[in-house]
């Protein structure tokens, strides 16, 4: 039996803009894990604790994402001369509580998890680029129009600067060419680890809301113009530079700017709870913003001294915002859940 795991992710900056090829986003891995156990079996058995039953490879709508991942990895392994054999795959870790998702990128986590499990089962090594391409190929074949930023972060398990690629072009190639040929091509993305040169606490607050409306989606599409994209790219690049050079004030300014850019896209991104989460950092050596799609789910904060961290956590608790995760970055004591 082999055990593998994948993490979740949250955006620090660049969400929405990253949907446009060539744009930048800064994304942080969150060690809230999904796990998979895989072992040899007489027949295929796939189980996820999202559901109350298991399946084989016969199409099942609930298990479609997992089954399609298995199919693509088997296609890849066949090109590598691997003899396929049946297995039992057991997936656990729903990244939700009381039926409400945390918004940590669980579909991306599932795809990467299945790929890692199968490659481990067949004792095949894969670097970050291959994992990213395989997982992205699964989602592109499904018609997923996401940026693949969650995949970039999940395969890295770190704080990463991601530059997006032309997904339409690669999806077209996947329709026309053999998988192996497409995997061998240059896709035009980049993934780089970012190491901050300053000390701070990173906190994740969960609002327990999910409220992405069609009105919000339309507003965002209408407002994602050239000016927004240029501002977003400059903000992310300056944020990364400030983190690497240890410039606390610039980090705060750039995250504030990233937050304002999101507000300019749609008034619905900041729900009342997310606005409270953000404004709780008033008078503190800290900065907070919505993370990801907005309209609910999670917000993040960076706090630059212990008193600010303590006060921010207290304010969040009083507002009914749950501290989902806390990590001490640049400290000797790395994290606390």
Could you describe each region identified by the protein language model?
Residues 115, 299-300:
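Short hydrophobic alpha-helical segments that form membrane-spanning helices or hydrophobic packing faces
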Residues 2-13, 17-20, 27-83, 96-99, ...:
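C-terminal nucleotide
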Residues 103-125, 158:
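DPxDG-like acidic metal-binding loop motif
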Residues 91-104, 118:
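Short acidic, glycine/Ser/Thr-rich loop/turn "cap" segments at secondary-structure junctions
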Residues 104-106, 288-295:
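Short glycine/threonine-rich catalytic loop with a Thr-x-Gly-x-Asp
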Residues 84-88:
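Residues at or immediately flanking beta-strands
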